[in-house]
């Protein structure tokens, strides 16, 4: 089959890769759309160790399920969690399988991902997509689940003041989700087209260079996760406020000199947000309350995946999608 993979340290695109050899309890999915993620970029650059197929965020149709299929997934359109823990592990039993250090992860560490014509995923990680949600929306299920998780981590009574730092895809999704959850939200970014998009959504927005540091925000969602953005977040948060670091990928662990004095002085809480309920993300997609139109900056055929990865590295891109069925 055609696949985008790392072999002997090189990125290869094309046919000749073996189809998945699925075991009992695994669904073989024909991939329709793949959303290029930061993790994919880290793998392609050699920052994240991997041998095999890239790709984590996708939507596809289940061709077959090996063994019993009690959920009748065969023929259904699905999305999948990239985190694949052993269901009987201690953390999985406690509902935290995505944090199991022994878990497999799609597209990382030797586990074949979804940037191919077919991908094999345990049925427990598959989530059916409702008939009314088309693939171009369903492909956002994973980043949307993460944005929703970031919003749910911090629960403040009333109408909290929330600032979202950044204007990347996860920031734009988080701003919409938080506004829907009755927060007073503003997004601070630098790109005029992203700020214009917020205006159409009814989300408050400003250029980040124009924002003051009044120390009055209940929650700061930092989607950039840099030393500079963290310093800005500390200056905006109220005493005993919360900073949520919204991310997805191990290769973001760059060492940076962050001044932690404000965290101590102002008694700030700093929380990481990486995982999320894919089912809740799909349900939010089904509701149709989020505006996802125009978030796909460019789309590519599977054979043009190298160009897609380059495009995804461009800060002017919001979301890059590969049509794996072309």
Place the predicted regions along the sequence by residue.
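Mid-domain Rossmann-like dinucleotide-binding core that forms the NAD(H)/NADP(H) cofactor-binding site
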Residues: 133-210
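Short glycine-centered segments of the SAM/dcSAM-binding site in methyltransferase folds
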Residues: 77, 161, 241-243, 269
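Glycine-rich cofactor phosphate-binding loops and adjacent beta1-alpha1 units
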Residues: 154-156, 186, 192, 196-267
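NAD(P)H dinucleotide-binding glycine-rich loop of Rossmann-like/cofactor-binding domains
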Residues: 84-165
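Glycine-rich beta-strand-centered segment in the early N-terminal region that forms part
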Residues: 20-34, 44-93, 130-132
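C-terminal substrate-binding/catalytic core of Rossmann-like NAD(P)-dependent dehydrogenases/reductases
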Residues: 250-298, 306-307, 316-317
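Local beta-strand N-terminus motif with an aromatic residue
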Residues: 116, 216-218, 292
């Amino acid at each position: 089959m055609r696949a985008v993979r790392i072999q002997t340290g090189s990125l290869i695109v094309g046919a000749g890769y073996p189809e998945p050899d699925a075991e009992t309890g695994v669904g073989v999915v024909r991939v329709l759309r793949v959303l290029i993620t930061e993790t994919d970029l880290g793998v392609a650059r050699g920052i994240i160790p991997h041998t095999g197929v890239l790709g984590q965020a996708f939507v596809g149709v289940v061709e077959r399920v090996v063994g019993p299929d009690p959920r009748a997934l065969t023929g259904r359109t699905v999305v999948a969690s990239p985190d694949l823990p052993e269901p009987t592990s201690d953390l999985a039993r406690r509902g935290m399988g995505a944090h199991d250090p022994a878990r497999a992860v799609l597209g990382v560490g030797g586990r074949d991902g979804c940037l191919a014509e077919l991908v094999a995923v345990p049925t427990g990680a598959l989530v059916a997509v409702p008939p009314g949600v088309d693939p171009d929306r369903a492909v956002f299920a994973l980043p949307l689940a993460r944005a929703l998780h970031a919003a749910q981590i911090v629960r403040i009574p009333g109408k909290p003041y929330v600032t979202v730092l950044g204007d990347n895809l996860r920031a734009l999704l988080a701003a919409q989700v938080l506004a829907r959850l009755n927060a007073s939200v503003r997004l601070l970014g630098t790109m005029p087209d992203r700020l214009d998009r917020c205006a159409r959504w009814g989300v408050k927005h400003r250029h980040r260079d124009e924002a003051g540091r009044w120390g009055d925000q209940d929650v700061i969602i930092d989607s950039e996760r840099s030393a500079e953005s963290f310093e800005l977040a500390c200056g905006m948060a109220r005493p005993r406020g919360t900073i949520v670091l919204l991310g997805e990928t191990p290769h973001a662990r760059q060492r940076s000199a962050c001044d932690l004095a404000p965290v101590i002085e102002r008694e700030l809480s700093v929380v990481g947000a990486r995982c999320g309920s894919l089912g809740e993300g799909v349900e939010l997609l089904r509701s149709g309350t989020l505006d996802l139109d125009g978030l796909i900056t460019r789309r590519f055929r599977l054979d043009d995946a190298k160009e897609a990865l380059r495009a995804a590295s461009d800060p002017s891109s919001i979301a890059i999608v590969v049509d794996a069925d072309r």
